[in-house]
Regions:
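Solvent-exposed, charged interface segments at domain starts and junctions
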Residues: 1, 9-12, 89, 136, ...
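Short linear elements at protein peripheries
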Residues: 50, 209-219
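N-terminal membrane-anchoring alpha-helices
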Residues: 1-48, 217
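A structural signal for short, hydrophobic/glycine-enriched beta-strand patches
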Residues: 31-193
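Serine/threonine-rich low-complexity intrinsically disordered regions
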Residues: 7-8, 116, 184, 209
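A transmembrane-helix-recognition feature enriched in membrane-embedded lipid enzymes
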Residues: 185-211
């Protein structure tokens, strides 16, 4: 190949590489926009009433909710007190060595805040967002529930809603806007990167990322 031919091939390769980088950047930018956009939407005010409020689990410390889990629970309890739905569903299993589960911790906290035990259901085996939502879908079907409000952190909402819709749940989102996971730009960027990776994996495989158990992924 002549030097001019090599130069031409190099320019083509550079152009293709540049186009690939621009395309990847555009996809990443749009995905980031969608994560943030969904997190700023609260569907609860436009619902006359729902059949259930589901709280996505997060870390717990021997029965004490982490600040992130507490923020989610407080928001869900406020929705329940406002008459948005007749019962709560707390979710999340436990990790090896845990004395209890995220769901049980959430249930006890809600009872302490005045929610009757009869108004709380639990999904206590899920170790990822998807596993919890699959179990929740079965609970909702057994109860004949329709419209369901899902509560989690803002940047978690897009993935929650996508999986719920794929499970044919009549899902509506209501993010906990005062979560510590959203308190600083560094935390927001960390959560955004986590969600982009988890969404990409789910889109490619239809399964939760293999290294994302509930307590690690939803601290």
């Amino acid at each position: 190949m002549t030097s001019s031919g090599r130069s031409s091939a190099g320019r083509v390769l550079a152009a293709v590489t540049l186009l690939g980088l621009v395309g990847a950047g555009a996809v990443l930018g749009y995905a980031t926009f969608r994560v943030w956009q969904r997190g700023n939407v609260d569907d609860a005010p436009r619902l006359a009433a729902a059949d259930a409020i589901v709280v996505l689990g997060a870390a717990q410390y021997n029965g004490r909710p982490s600040p992130v889990l507490k923020a989610r629970l407080d928001h869900a309890i406020a929705l329940w007190r406002a008459g948005r739905a007749p019962f709560l569903v707390t979710t999340g299993g436990g990790q090896e060595g845990d004395l209890t589960t995220e769901a049980a911790t959430g249930r006890e906290y809600a009872i302490e805040q005045g929610v009757p035990a009869s108004a709380i259901l639990m999904e206590d085996r899920g170790r990822s967002t998807q596993e919890s939502l699959e179990a929740v879908a079965a609970i909702l079907e057994q109860r004949g529930a329709g419209a369901t409000v899902f509560v989690s952190d803002r940047l978690h909402m897009l993935r929650v809603m996508r999986i719920a819709k794929d499970l044919r749940i009549d899902a509506y989102g209501s993010p906990a806007t005062d979560s510590p996971s959203d308190a600083t730009m560094a935390r927001r960027l960390e959560a955004t990167m986590h969600e982009l990776a988890a969404l990409a994996w789910y889109g490619l495989t239809g399964r939760p990322a293999p290294d994302q158990p509930a307590a690690a992924a939803r601290t």
